[in-house]
Amino acid sequence: MAAGLRKSVEAINGTPLPHGILNTPCTDVRDVADEHELLGVEWLALGCCPVRSWTDPCGDESPGEESPGDESGAPGTKEFCRPETEHAEPITLYAGAECSTIGWSYAEAREHAEATLALGEQQGLEAAFWRQKLTRDAVDLTPAEGPLSVAQGVAVLEGCLAESYGGVGVLHVPAGAAALLGCCDLARENTATGGLSTLTGNCVIIGAGYSAENTGPGGTPADPGTAWLYITGPLVVRRGPSVTIPDRPGPSVNIRNNDRRVLVERTYVVGTTCTVCAVQVEVCP
């Protein structure tokens, strides 16, 4: 059928994946208006210092009788941990719509750009967090012999997290490897919250943006038939309001070519704590 005879209808709406970084109950998503929080944040790490057991060297001496400032190293001395300052940098995502002014109004261009960001912000944020945090800070636990099975990889990652953090963490899984979590019953859905968790209790994020990246520490691309999995402490996402540029029709038009451009952007700050571990797994053995 000739293009001129086709009837124009509304766009096909989509739905972001239910277990992505913004939709899962694993993530604490906070909509903030304070622009200072959107420039980056820092905090004292909590839960990264170990809680140790103390043995009374005398057997019958009260633990409270020693000086809290004693650094002699003698038997019974208690160790102190200085919490580290952690930080998270801003991530700005945008979607731009470009069209001819003939047949497409400013309102239509704006609506299209805003809908594009709403649908794609989760995927975009996952990809950016993967590049800017996971691949930069992770400890690679892949053995010299090569990639592990998915079950072995999850076990190694959860062990890594447990050694440095005593709370619930987050397992980050590319969408392309997610189906293999069901092979060994590695993730289960909480019927009350709809979230996924492992047998250990760690949350699971399945990311389309993770699958688009699928790189290891340092940005190393995954070998064919493999995928990278990561684990972190809990996540807090600070999300600012979306901003539409320009906010009125006139400035959206380029008078040189009569094209219209509308941009929508939003800033996020994604924080996690204590440790990041990575492992390469086989998805096509």
Feature-to-residue mapping (PLM):
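Sequence/fold signature of self-assembling virion shell proteins
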Residues: 194-285
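Long, contiguous amphipathic alpha-helices that act as assembly "spine/axial" helices in icosahedral shell
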Residues: 83-142
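Short N-terminal signal/transit or membrane-insertion segments
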Residues: 1-34, 104-106, 110, 249-252, ...
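A generic structural signal for short, non-catalytic loop/turn and secondary-structure boundary residues
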Residues: 84-88, 164-166, 255
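The N-terminal extracellular segments of secreted preproproteins, especially immediately downstream
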Residues: 25, 47-48, 57, 80, ...
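Generic detector of well-ordered alpha-helical segments enriched in charged/polar residues
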Residues: 114, 122, 126, 130, ...
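Assembly/oligomerization interface modules of large self-assembling protein complexes
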Residues: 2-91
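Extended, solvent-exposed, turn-rich assembly/linker loops in the middle of proteins
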Residues: 138-203
